Amino acid sequence: MLAAEVAGLGNYGMRGTRHSVGMEVLDRLARQLAVAEGWRVDKRCCADVALATAHGLELVLLKPRRFMNLNGLSVASAAEIYSLGPGDIYLVHDDLDKALGKVAIKLGGSARGHNGVQSCISALQSNEMTRLRIGIGRPEGDVTVPNYVLSPFSAGEREKLDQILAQAVTCLLEHIQSRAPAEPGDRG
C-alpha cells in the first residue's frame, strides 16, 4: 500500500493560535478518518502520531511536539521511520498571504518566509513537499507579524474556523485521492 505523511505544522502547546492552525486541521482530519482516539506520542520523532487510511493510501498523521522553527526535525524523522520521501509528505500550515478562509494546495517551492516550512526544507534537504496552505490574513494596524501569528483567533474568526477546517480537510483528501492508485476496473 502506498503511504503519505501529513504533518500539521505549529507550535506545540500553543493550540488555538493562528500559527498552529495546521495542527487543528490534523485534529479535524483524524476525526473524519475515525482515528481521533489513535494519537500516540512517538518519542522517535518527537511528535503525536496517528495512522489512518484514505483512498487506498496509508497515512501517517503527525503533529510535532516542537516549536514551529524545529518542526522539520519531527517531519524528517517520521519520514525516515516510515520510509517516505519528500514527495510523499504534505505540510499543512498557516499562510499570511492568503485571506482568512482561503485554502490552497501548493506543489513544492520555497518556504515564502514560513519558518516551519523552512525547517522542513532544511531537515529533508528538499522542497518537494506538497503544502496545504490555510489563509490567516495579515495583521491590521501596528500589530507585528509575530504577535499576530502567535495570538488566538478572534471570536469572529473562530466562528468561521469550523467551516475553514472542513474545507481544508476536503481539499487535502481530494488531493490525496488524486494520488491514490486506481481501483481495479477503473479506466482513468
Residue spans of the language-model regions?
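Nucleotide and nucleotide-moiety/phosphate-recognizing core
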Residues: M1-G108, Q118, S122-L132, P139-T144, ...
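Short glycine-enriched, charge-decorated loop/helix-capping segments at active-site entrances
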Residues: A104-S110, Y148-F153
